[in-house]
Amino acid sequence: MGASWHQTIRALGSAHHVEVDGSQRHRMCQNEFVEVLNRGKPSVEQIIRIGMDTSKSVFQLHGVNAVEQPILRKKLSRREMVKFFEKTPPTIIALEACGGSHHWARLLSSFGHEVKLIAPQLAKPYVKRGKNDAADAEALCEAMSRPTMRFVPMKTADQQAALMLVGMRERLIRNRTQLANAIRGFAMEFGIVAAKGMCRIEALLERIAADPSLPELAQDLFALHGQEYRELACQIKTLDEKLMKLHRADECSKRLAEIPGVGPIGASLLLMKTPDPRMFKSGRDFAAWIGLTPKDHSTAGKVRLGVITRAGDEMLRSILVVGATSLLQQVRTGRSRHASAWLMGLLQRKRPKLVAVALANKLARIAWKLMTSGESYRQAEGQAQTS
């Protein structure tokens, strides 16, 4: 070994109060170097990376030093964890992107730490054996060290409030749909049917209320269903107004709403649910993040593409596909100005549902371009606005 290696050994031995004579220095290998480094009492100053498994009240920590040796294994309560990181020198902390993780990321960042959020499915392969808090914390610590690891962007409190609005609206719409189906099902038991569409429910309830052949108990129960349906509709309207208020206050959302098939609601959801669009290298990467690109089953040099991956946010993907389907219906009936040669050619070769997904992919790419460039949507010369 060279002189510089021996000098390092002597310095480490002196720093850790370990006596190393000449014969030992000559026999010392890299493993012994690690052993010397870790003799003595480990301190938080040696920690370069911490993985933390979070829960409601118990937090498991796993920290390593510069030579990847575990020097911290602790289980702390909520209060103890906060105090620990307040006193710990700035380091890198890995958290699983789950409930409450964005709150902890903001808090720990305020203490000077660099926080990385890792998706659960990306941390899972690093769990060696069994499922417990210590193994999860170690897996997070190991996963964070990978140079190609992908991380979840930390959300601000305002972003989470906006997503709460979106989630609440989605839940109310789902409840209204379930209630409408229940009303239709119960009405059919008494021989009363209605045409498709949410707009037909009020007329159905009026017919039921005016039908003298129904038992009094059934009339009362249908009245309760009707009251609940109207309350849900009122709550959804209130949330839509809040969503539109946020849309009108944001210039980027206004630009996105100009894209055919997107609209104000779709633009607001795109802006709220999308992290920093500059994270994506291209519009294709953004569409892949939403789950609008085909699965790759290629092998032996043969390219085989299947159905779309359906990765990413389901609601965001649904909004784009529904918007594309609506735009496609207008094109097929001749009521749209956006019938490009590309779109008409695709309609001749492929099924309408497949074309709608392809169009949704193109809408996602256009949205990414507007979000990253700051430009307004404009129609190209001689082309449709969606081409």
Curated annotation (Swiss-Prot):
Q: Name the Gene Ontology biological process terms.
A: DNA transposition
An example of a Pfam family matching this protein is: DEDD_Tnp_IS110
Q: Name one GO molecular function term.
A: DNA binding
Q: Which residues form the signal peptide?
A: none
Question: Which domain of life does the UniProt lineage start with?
Answer: Bacteria
Which keywords does this chain's UniProt record carry? DNA recombination, DNA-binding, Plasmid, Transposable element, Transposition
| Family stated for the protein in its record | Belongs to the transposase 20 family.
Could you identify this protein by its name? Putative transposase y4pF/y4sB
According to its UniProt entry, this protein's organism is Sinorhizobium fredii (strain NBRC 101917 / NGR234)
